A protein has these predicted regions:
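The structured alpha-helical core of multi-pass membrane proteins
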Residues: 1-214
Length: 214
């Protein structure tokens, strides 16, 4: 899937890009409902917004708390990708999308995962998929794969845009940049960057093998 994603970049994403929005809306709606379902089983998980618990954790389990920061940083780094797309959409649509859909869905799902672990402390691996009912597991896996591909595409597009801007500002030497759309200036393809990204991404996947190792 990863190699295929990079291989089709030169064709542009204009045609398939029309389904990205609806798919992501379904994705965020799904993870929000999954989280809410488990929150209702253990509503006390909402207390985790109180910073007292984080301070208490660091005070009594400093080593474990420090190691847990790795997972926390992995959660928040995805937010940095929003800035890469600022030139495509502008500040207002991104802010509205973040506060109106993305942030509430993520909070509900992470609370739901915490609530699930309260009732199933032995299921500490792949918590997200373990909290999905068995009959819905396959559709959610397919949906998660689609969401991952779309998120990866957003990052690739963002890197292409940043590279093009850096070339225009003479921060990078001139390299080949192809326009893949006759109507949208932002639809570009940078072959050198595309293949360097592919090698780096495949190397990371083979090296770490899981997000927990990362």
């Amino acid at each position: 899937i990863l190699v295929g994603l990079f291989a089709v970049q030169r064709r542009g994403t204009g045609a398939v890009g029309k389904v990205f929005g609806p798919v992501m809306m379904v994705w965020f709606g799904t993870i929000a409902m999954l989280g809410l379902w488990h929150i209702l089983d253990s509503p006390g998980i909402i207390k985790s917004v109180n910073p007292y618990y984080a301070i208490h954790f660091f005070g009594h389990e400093s080593t474990k708390a420090f190691l847990s920061l790795g997972s926390i940083f992995l959660v928040v780094t995805g937010g940095e990708a929003l800035y890469a797309d600022m030139g495509h959409f502008g500040r207002r649509p991104i802010v509205l999308g973040w506060y109106g859909m993305v942030l509430p869905s993520l909070l509900l799902n992470y609370w739901g995962q915490g609530a699930f672990l309260i009732g199933h402390p032995e299921d500490v691996h792949s918590v997200f998929f373990r909290m999905v009912p068995g009959s819905l597991l396959l559709p959610v896996v397919v949906l998660a794969t689609c969401a991952t591909v779309i998120a990866s595409q957003a990052l690739i597009t963002g890197v292409f845009s940043l590279t093009a801007q850096a070339v225009k500002l003479d921060y990078l030497p001139r390299i080949k940049i192809l326009h893949t759309s006759q109507s949208q200036e932002g639809q570009i393809y940078v072959p050198l960057v595309n293949w360097l990204l592919m090698v780096a991404c495949v190397g990371l996947v083979l090296g770490f093998r899981s997000s927990s190792n990362l």
